[in-house]
Design a protein with these regions (language model features):
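Metallo-beta-lactamase
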Residues: 18, 115, 119-167, 173-174
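Conserved beta-strand hairpin/beta-sheet module of binuclear metal-dependent hydrolase folds
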Residues: 8, 19-83, 166-182, 201
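Short acidic-hydrophobic surface loop/beta-edge motif
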Residues: 62, 146-151, 257-260
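Binuclear metal-ion centers of metallo-dependent hydrolases, dominated by the metallo-beta-lactamase
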Residues: 188-201, 206-260
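Cationic, low-complexity basic patches in intrinsically disordered or flexible, solvent-exposed regions
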Residues: 4-7, 15
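Short beta->alpha connector loops
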Residues: 74-77, 99, 123, 160-165, ...
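Active-site metal-binding motif and surrounding structural segment of the metallo-beta-lactamase
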Residues: 65-120, 198-201
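Active-site neighborhood of phospho(di)ester-bond hydrolases with catalytic His/Asp-centered motifs
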Residues: 70-74, 90-98, 120-121, 179-184, ...
Length: 260
């Protein structure tokens, strides 16, 4: 059963957990332009500027057994890594080739000397990796629906429904399951849906309020219906635009963390 987000929020003091567990932190929860949006005076953007609120572009850091896995490298990556105390990154997964999900990889230039392992579907790596020849990295193709071990966790990619090849993922460790799928419509294939069920934590695309429909994303009503169908124990929206009010009950917040 879905629960209001406010009832599930964890205080920072509750997040000191065994390193063998997954610590999942959303480094950003915004869409391609972030919130507040440049040159916008809507209520949400005004409130953001008045109260110092932000939604940086969506990416996720997972810490597990001393290793750090980054999902997507946004244009806000430098700020996001500083906010999270800039841990050493052992692996990166690119979900797809839209600029707000991978162009921040350039921020690793002269920051991390070791070769960075970058995972993703073959077509995603071909496109994104070709732009960053100046950064030492190793590209490791991952086929959808085939589990692989990344940073000591079992990761399985599955396709979403977007205007470019895009992949969500199921990540398992120590008997817990995290499912992440952004930049997709709700009409996901049955094969993908089968991997998304019964997650301990589910993060979904929720870019617009109910009644606003576009061809390549879910609105929040779509996301809520899907989360209920998938029987998620805990559910939040990410990749939100400036049209989503700050008090929306399933809105994740930048730098919010969970321990699984």
């Amino acid at each position: 059963m879905l629960q209001p987000a406010w009832s599930l929020f964890r205080e920072e003091t509750q997040l000191e957990a065994d390193a063998s567990k997954m610590k999942i932190t959303v480094l950003g929860t915004g869409d391609t332009v972030g919130t507040p949006k440049v040159n916008c005076d809507c209520e949400v953007c005004r409130q953001a500027k008045e109260e110092g609120r932000e939604r940086l572009r969506t990416s996720i850091l997972i810490e597990h057994n001393g290793q750090n896995l980054l999902i997507d490298t946004t244009p806000d990556l430098r700020r996001q890594l500083l906010a999270s105390n800039a841990p050493h990154i052992d692996g990166v997964i690119w979900t797809h080739g839209h600029f707000d999900h991978f162009m921040g990889f350039a921020d690793f230039y002269r920051v991390q000397r070791e070769i960075i392992k970058v995972y993703g579907a073959p077509e995603v790596l071909d496109y994104c990796g070709s732009i960053f020849s100046f950064i030492r990295h190793e590209e490791i193709p991952v086929l959808p629906f085939e589990p692989v071990e990344i940073c000591g966790m079992e990761v399985t990619l599955f396709p979403g429904v977007h205007d470019t090849p895009t992949y969500g993922m199921r990540i398992r460790a120590d008997g817990k399951t995290f499912v992440y799928s952004c930049d997709t419509r709700a009409e996901i294939s049955k094969e993908s849906l089968s991997l998304m069920r019964d997650a301990d934590l589910l993060l979904l695309d929720g870019i617009f309020p109910p009644g606003v429909n576009i061809a390549k994303h879910m609105n929040t009503a779509d996301a809520e219906r899907l989360a209920k169908e998938l029987n998620a124990k805990e559910f939040w929206c990410v990749h939100m635009s400036h049209k989503i009010p700050w008090d929306y009950k399933y809105a994740a917040s930048d730098m919010q963390s969970w321990i699984l």
